[in-house]
Amino acid sequence: KISKCPNAVMKVGGAQQRVGAWEPPFHNNLRQSPIGSTELCDLLYERYIYAIEAFGPDRCMFESNFPVDKECVSYRTLWNMFKLVAKRAGLSTSEKTAVFSRTAQQVYRLN
């Protein structure tokens, strides 16, 4: 319902972090080695694309919750995963610009 409101935007991120006592299966505490961006994308793609499809790329912005996310995934891995999500979704150059920068610039009035 919120996506139907034209002034609502979605910060797309956070699906990889711990929630209360629940730890995602890729949490660093549960792995022999850190997760890579491709594996993370495979696990979380459906969650992220759901938001992008509901709101549209022009009302979504990728975001991180660093330093909180650090316990689950590296900063580099997270942003590389976002690049893979955009590629897998077939986002155009303009749509990629929206989710990686333009939406945030508009929402936070950074222009």
Predicted regions and their residues:
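Catalytic pocket-lining loop regions of alpha/beta-barrel enzymes
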Residues: 1-61, 106
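Mid-to-C-terminal alpha-helical segments outside catalytic/metal-binding sites
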Residues: 10, 46-50, 54-61, 70-111
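Short catalytic/ligand-binding loop motif for oxyanion handling, primarily in non-cytosolic enzymes
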Residues: 18-21, 69-73
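Active-site metal-binding loops of divalent metal-dependent hydrolases
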Residues: 65-66
